[in-house]
Amino acid sequence: MARLALSPVPSHWMVALLLLLSAEPVPAARSEDRYRNPKGSACSRIWQSPRFIARKRGFTVKMHCYMNSASGNVSWLWKQEMDENPQQLKLEKGRMEESQNESLATLTIQGIRFEDNGIYFCQQKCNNTSEVYQGCGTELRVMGFSTLAQLKQRNTLKDGIIMIQTLLIILFIIVPIFLLLDKDDSKAGMEEDHTYEGLDIDQTATYEDIVTLRTGEVKWSVGEHPGQE
């Protein structure tokens, strides 16, 4: 009886067929995922420049906001702490100024102060739709000379550190030296106390018991050597 012979199929074709039957469908990549904005980041429609500014007090800084389209009004938001929500920035006349030219909006702050520290966001609201786009933010850090209160605080801190160092020196250097000196003095006193230890006072001879040494007569005359006869 003739047996049925299976046609030889390459193993890699079978593996590929099994993978196609068992694998989940892979979603097609969207065009916006393939072509990301090279100038910005996750804030797709608008981006800010620079992302961080550090200037001394009294300088003038500018923050730029670039947009894909010029349609819509641009406003600026500001928050001082990271965990706060951005609030509408109140422009001070003569010191803060905002300008918009087609796809570029600029915020200018003159004579920056410590109160201007924070993160600034540009926000665009389109005219045709209700969509609102917000930039990633620009952090401003104002640097300058310390105030009188800060100087006093630093001086107090320095005095405290010096006091702590002095106490540590006394504790770890001077105190051990005094302890060693005190130990040496006590050791010398103990040696003096043990000088007459074991001596029985009752058995010692008194002054009257001391026998007077009497010298005998000399057998040789002056000038004669004792070895001569």
UniProtKB/Swiss-Prot annotation:
Residues 38-138 form the Ig-like V-type domain. Keywords: Adaptive immunity, Cell membrane, Disease variant, Disulfide bond, Glycoprotein, Immunity, Immunoglobulin domain, Membrane, Phosphoprotein, Receptor, Signal, Transmembrane, Transmembrane helix. The keyword Cytoplasm does not apply. The modification Phosphotyrosine is found at residues 196, 207. Residues 1-28 form the signal peptide. Residues 29-159 are extracellular. GO terms for cellular component: B cell receptor complex; external side of plasma membrane; extracellular exosome; IgM B cell receptor complex; plasma membrane. It is found in: Cell membrane. The chain crosses the membrane at residues 160-180. Glycans are attached at residues 73, 101, 127-128. Residues 181-229 are cytoplasmic. GO terms for molecular function: identical protein binding; transmembrane signaling receptor activity. InterPro entries: Ig-like_dom, Ig-like_dom_sf, Ig-like_fold, Ig_sub, Ig_V-set, Phos_immunorcpt_sig_ITAM. Phosphorylated on tyrosine upon B-cell activation by SRC-type Tyr-kinases such as BLK, LYN and SYK. Disulfide bonds join 43-126, 65-122. One of its GO terms (biological process) is immune response. B-cells. It is a single-pass type I membrane protein. The keyword Ribosomal protein does not apply. It holds the Pfam family V-set. Residues 185-213 form the ITAM domain. Required in cooperation with CD79A for initiation of the signal transduction cascade activated by the B-cell antigen receptor complex (BCR) which leads to internalization of the complex, trafficking to late endosomes and antigen presentation. Enhances phosphorylation of CD79A, possibly by recruiting kinases which phosphorylate CD79A or by recruiting proteins which bind to CD79A and protect it from dephosphorylation. Heterodimer of alpha and beta chains; disulfide-linked. Part of the B-cell antigen receptor complex where the alpha/beta chain heterodimer is non-covalently associated with an antigen-specific membrane-bound surface immunoglobulin of two heavy chains and two light chains. Interacts with LYN. It is linked to Agammaglobulinemia 6, autosomal recessive: A primary immunodeficiency characterized by profoundly low or absent serum antibodies and low or absent circulating B-cells due to an early block of B-cell development. Affected individuals develop severe infections in the first years of life. The transmembrane helices of CD79A and CD79B chains and two IgM heavy chains assembly in a four-helix bundle structure that appears to be conserved among different BCR isotypes. This is B-cell antigen receptor complex-associated protein beta chain. The lineage of its organism: Eukaryota, Metazoa, Chordata, Craniata, Vertebrata.
